Regions:
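Intrinsically disordered, low-complexity regulatory tails
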Residues: 1-11
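Active-site loop/lid in soluble adenylation, ligation, and acyl-transfer enzymes
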Residues: 11-133
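Signature for HUH/AEP ssDNA processing cores
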Residues: 100, 105-172
């Protein structure tokens, strides 16, 4: 049966140049996925993931102690920024806020070190804040919504967008 404990492992504790504190901390309980395992996974898919998230302002879901513990959304950064990242100043009402932007795999793994479990990109690039080039429809079904209904919704949405000559693709 699945447990909340990951098997004890020796070995790599630095991933993409980022030292991982608590590398054996379980972030996802079943099956047990540790911070180190997640960092290694993102390092392995960085070439495919970075073209979609690098250079875009981010909103992050942070769960420093893993799923099931206290989580919070972070949009703004003031002081600490992991290597491989920078901030972009974006005006908001009467102030200017700093948003995180990933540059490379080091930044991606640096966010795992901070307990980031979800990356939500803006629909624009950091150098074209007022010119979105991407629109995302996030289909998060409620607990009582059957998967077949989600699929039907996605197919209907795709058909309507393509009728408007908009290119669509699935992103998970």
């Amino acid at each position: 049966p699945p447990t909340d404990k990951a098997p004890a492992r020796k070995g790599k504790r630095t991933v993409a140049g980022i030292h991982l504190s608590h590398p054996d901390r379980v972030l996802y309980p079943a099956p047990a996925i540790t911070k180190e395992t997640l960092a290694q996974f993102y390092e392995s898919i960085a070439d495919r993931m970075l073209p979609h998230i690098a250079g875009r302002p981010l909103m992050l879901l942070r769960c420093p102690n893993g799923v099931g513990s206290e989580c919070f959304h972070q949009k703004h950064f003031r002081d600490y920024m992991p290597k491989g990242m920078h901030t972009v100043d974006i005006p908001e009402k009467s102030t200017v806020r700093k948003y995180a932007v990933i540059e490379n795999v080091t930044g991606l793994v640096g966010l795992v070190q901070l307990g980031v479990l979800e990356f939500h990109i803006w629909g624009c690039r950091e150098d074209e804040i007022e010119k979105p080039d991407r629109m995302i429809f996030d289909l998060d079904p409620g607990p009582n919504v059957p998967w077949a209904a989600v699929i039907e919704c996605a197919l209907t949405l795709r058909a309507r967008l393509e009728a408007l000559s908009l290119k669509t693709f699935v992103k998970t």
